[in-house]
Design a protein with these regions (language model features):
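Non-heme di-metal
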Residues: 1-158
């Protein structure tokens, strides 16, 4: 999905990333606040995280309009994202962390890269399975259409 992007599309991606990160950060902060004994602050973070999710979804709806999406497109976009993480992002991050002597970060990036590959493989397998199913459905629909056409021809020939 390497298409040229407008500045607005880039801004939507950045806004989505910010809202999604805020959601995860606030959920984490809520857990920490609860462990530290402050339930009121934990709930504040959790409510705010829910609102951030709404903001992120609003951006996603503009980035990936429902009217333009198919199951195949969704799976392909997800696959490409996971492959980017596997082949480019995490290896680069791991190397940079290695150069800076951040061994815990190196291990984290390597582990996440491996998990991203697993995710990519799952999306690819489902994409292949869906393609086979749609191909089979196409044959079934063609057979039905042929029978309908034959039946219509018999009825109109009378």
């Amino acid at each position: 999905m390497n298409q040229p992007q407008t500045k607005t599309q880039q801004n939507l991606q950045a806004a989505f990333a910010g809202e999604a990160m805020a959601n995860r950060r606030y959920l984490y902060f809520g857990q920490l606040a609860r462990k530290l004994g402050n339930e009121e602050v934990a709930q504040l973070f959790e409510r705010t995280a829910d609102e951030e999710t709404g903001h992120a979804f609003a951006h996603l709806q503009l980035m990936y309009p429902e009217s333009e999406m198919t199951v195949e497109k969704l799976l392909q976009i997800a696959y490409e994202g996971e492959m980017y993480e596997t082949e480019q992002m995490y290896p680069t991050f791991a190397e940079e962390a290695r150069q800076e002597g951040e061994s815990a970060a190196v291990a984290e990036f390597i582990e996440q890269g491996a998990e991203s590959r697993e995710h990519a493989e799952r999306f690819k397998a489902m994409l292949q399975r869906a393609a086979k199913q749609f191909k089979a459905f196409g044959r079934v629909e063609a057979a039905h259409a042929k029978r309908y056409a034959e039946a219509l021809e018999k009825v109109t020939a009378r």
